[in-house]
C-alpha cells in the first residue's frame, strides 16, 4: 500500500464512522507541499463535522490509527496521521466541545483543537479537500502578526529543546515567512537558507537537508544545541529586519491609508514609526513581544479614568496609533524642563489626577506591583549577580523580610506611573499643562513611590519644592517603608541593565 492509498483508506474509515454527521476532511502540510519524507514527516488532516461528534463516534475514532495497523500490519503510514476532529462551528469559532485528537505522542478525546497560524495558512493556501463540502471560505486567513507570534514561540522552543536537526529547518522556514508572509516546505526552506547564506553552520544545514531527503536511511539526526542557538540568533535579528513589514500589515488591519512610513526607533521588539499621509502624520508603535503589549490596554485604561494622555487614535492587539508630537499642541520636554518650577507644577497636577482617579481601579484589579518583586528568591539573585553575599545589609533584610513585605503591602494602593524621566515627558506649547507618555511600566503601588521617582529626576531644588507644594499632602509614613522597599526593588530591576551595580552596593 502506497501513501496515496493509505490516505484514501483512512479517509474512507473516517467517513464511515461519521457518515451521519456530514464530515469534511482536509489534507495539508508536507504531503500536499510535496515534501513528505517517510521517517520524518507526519500526515496532517483536519476533520470537521456538521454537529458535535457523539461519544460513540469519538470512541471509534480515537483509536482508529491502531485499529488500522492491526488490520494492515507493517503499514508505515497509518501511525503518521495527525490532527483534530470536531464540528466546523467549534473549530471556526474556537469553542469547546467533544473533540478527537491524534498526535505524535498519542491520542485522546479532549474538548478543543486549534491549528496555529502557520498551519492555518497552509490549510487555506494549499490544503486538499479529501471528502465533503469545502468550507474554507468561512475561515479567516491568519494575520502576519499572528505568524510572527507563533514563529517567536517556536524559536523559544527550539532554543530550549533543540537537539535534532529538524529544528534548523523550522527556523529557516520561520525566516522565510517573516520576510515574505508566505509558507514554504521545510526542505525548500533549508535549501533557500543555504542559497542565501543565512545559517552560520552551513555544514549542519547541508546535513539536515540530506537527512530529510534520505530520512528512511539516515538514522542519526541529533545536533548540538549550540548550533540551534546560533541559527536562532539569526531569526531573532530577522524580527528587527522585518519590522517594516509588520508595521505595514498593522496599518492595513487598522485601515490606515498612508504615503510614507519612516522608522523612529526599533529596540527590544518595539518599533516606533512616523506615518505620513495627505492628512498629516501620526506615530505608530508596534510590539513584537507579548509582555510589552500591555501598554495598549494601559492607554485605554487611563483614557477611561479621565487621566490626560496623548491622543490615542487607533489600535490592534499588538500596535497602536497616537498623535505625532511634532505636530501636536505638546512638545517633547528637554532636560532643562526638569529644573523649571512651573513645569514641575504641571507634572504634579498630572500625577495627582493619576493617583486620585486610579485608586478605585488599582484596589479592584490585579496589576503589576513593584513590591511583589521583594522575595527571598530575588534577593538571592541580587546577591549572586552582584557578588555581595557577605554584606551585612542582606542579613538585616532577610531577617526582617516578612515585616518589610507586610509593611509595603499594607500601604494604600493607587495607579503608579513608575517610569518618570524627561524623555517620557511632553509639555504644552502654551505651557498650560504637562503629561507623561509610554505606559509600559504602569502598575499599582503607593503614592510616595511615584513622588520619589519624580523628585529624583527633577533637576533643581526649586523644581522639587514646586512639585511637592502643588501635589499637596500624602502619607509621609510611606517614605519610611519606601526607603527600604525602593532600595531592594531598585537593585532587582537594576540587574537587567547595570553591570556595575555591585560598585554602588
Per-range role (PLM):
Residues 415, 428-468, 476:
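Active-site Asp-x-Gly
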Residues 58, 63-161, 174:
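Conserved NTP/Mg2+-binding pocket subregion across the NTase superfamily
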Residues 269-271, 276-366:
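ATP-binding pocket architecture of kinase catalytic cores
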Residues 25-63, 80-83:
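Catalytic metal-binding acidic patch
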Residues 1-26, 57-58, 385-404:
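Helical scaffold of the NTase/Pol beta-like nucleotidyltransferase catalytic core
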Residues 115, 122-240:
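Conserved nucleotidyltransferase catalytic core and NTase-mimicking acidic/glycine-rich helix/loop elements
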Residues 345, 453-456, 465-505:
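Helix-rich C-terminal or lid/interface subdomains of diverse kinases
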Residues 334-392, 411-413, 443-444:
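A cross-family kinase active-site recognition segment
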Amino acid at each position: 500500500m502506497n501513501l496515496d492509498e493509505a490516505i484514501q483508506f483512512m479517509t474512507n474509515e473516517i467517513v464511515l464512522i461519521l457518515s451521519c454527521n456530514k464530515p469534511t476532511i482536509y489534507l495539508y502540510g508536507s504531503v500536499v507541499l510535496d515534501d513528505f519524507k517517510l521517517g520524518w514527516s507526519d500526515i496532517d488532516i483536519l476533520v470537521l463535522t456538521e454537529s458535535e461528534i457523539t461519544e460513540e463516534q469519538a470512541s471509534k475514532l480515537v483509536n482508529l490509527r491502531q485499529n488500522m495497523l492491526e488490520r494492515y500490519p507493517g503499514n508505515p503510514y497509518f501511525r503518521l496521521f495527525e490532527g483534530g476532529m470536531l464540528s466546523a462551528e467549534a473549530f471556526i469559532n474556537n469553542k469547546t466541545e467533544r473533540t478527537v485528537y491524534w498526535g505524535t505522542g498519542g491520542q485522546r478525546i479532549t474538548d478543543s483543537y486549534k491549528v496555529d497560524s502557520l498551519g492555518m495558512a497552509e490549510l487555506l493556501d494549499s490544503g486538499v479537500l479529501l471528502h465533503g463540502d469545502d468550507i474554507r471560505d468561512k475561515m479567516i486567513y491568519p494575520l502576519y502578526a499572528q505568524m510572527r507570534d507563533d514563529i517567536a514561540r517556536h524559536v523559544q522552543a527550539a532554543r530550549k529543546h533543540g537537539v535534532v536537526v529538524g529544528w534548523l529547518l523550522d527556523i529557516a522556514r520561520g525566516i522565510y515567512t517573516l520576510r515574505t508572509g508566505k509558507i514554504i516546505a521545510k526542505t525548500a526552506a533549508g535549501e533557500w537558507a543555504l542559497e542565501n547564506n543565512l545559517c552560520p553552520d552551513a555544514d549542519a544545514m547541508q546535513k539536515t537537508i540530506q537527512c530529510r531527503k534520505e530520512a528512511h536511511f539516515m538514522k542519526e539526526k541529533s545536533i548540538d544545541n549550540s548550533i540551534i542557538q546560533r541559527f536562532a540568533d539569526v531569526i531573532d535579528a530577522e524580527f528587527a529586519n522585518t519590522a517594516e513589514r509588520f508595521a505595514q500589515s498593522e496599518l492595513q488591519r487598522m485601515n490606515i491609508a498612508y504615503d510614507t512610513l519612516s522608522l523612529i526607533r526599533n529596540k527590544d521588539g518595539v518599533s516606533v514609526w512616523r506615518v505620513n499621509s495627505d492628512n498629516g502624520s501620526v506615530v505608530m508603535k508596534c510590539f513584537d513581544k507579548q509582555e510589552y503589549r500591555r501598554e495598549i490596554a494601559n492607554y485605554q485604561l487611563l483614557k477611561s479614568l479621565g487621566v490626560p494622555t496623548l491622543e490615542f487614535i487607533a489600535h490592534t492587539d499588538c500596535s497602536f496609533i497616537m498623535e505625532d508630537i511634532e505636530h501636536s499642541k505638546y512638545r517633547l520636554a528637554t532636560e532643562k524642563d526638569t529644573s523649571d518650577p512651573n513645569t514641575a507644577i504641571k507634572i504634579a497636577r498630572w500625577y495627582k489626577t493619576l493617583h486620585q482617579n486610579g485608586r478605585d481601579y488599582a484596589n479592584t484589579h490585579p496589576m503589576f506591583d513593584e513590591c511583589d518583586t521583594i522575595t527571598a528568591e530575588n534577593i538571592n539573585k541580587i546577591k549572586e549577580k552582584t557578588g555581595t553575599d557577605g554584606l551585612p545589609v542582606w542579613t538585616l533584610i532577610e531577617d526582617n523580610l516578612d515585616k518589610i513585605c507586610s509593611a509595603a503591602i499594607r500601604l494604600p494602593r493607587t495607579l503608579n506611573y513608575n517610569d518618570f524621566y524627561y524623555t517620557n515627558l511632553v509639555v504644552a506649547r502654551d505651557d498650560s499643562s504637562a503629561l507623561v507618555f509610554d505606559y509600559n511600566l504602569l502598575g499599582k503601588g503607593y503614592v510616595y513611590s511615584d513622588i520619589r521617582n519624580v523628585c529624583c529626576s527633577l533637576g533643581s531644588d526649586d523644581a522639587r519644592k514646586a512639585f511637592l507644594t502643588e501635589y499637596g499632602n500624602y502619607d509621609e509614613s510611606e517614605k519610611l517603608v519606601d526607603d527600604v522597599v525602593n532600595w531592594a526593588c531598585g537593585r532587582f530591576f537594576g540587574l537587567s541593565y547595570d553591570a556595575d551595580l555591585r560598585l554602588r552596593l
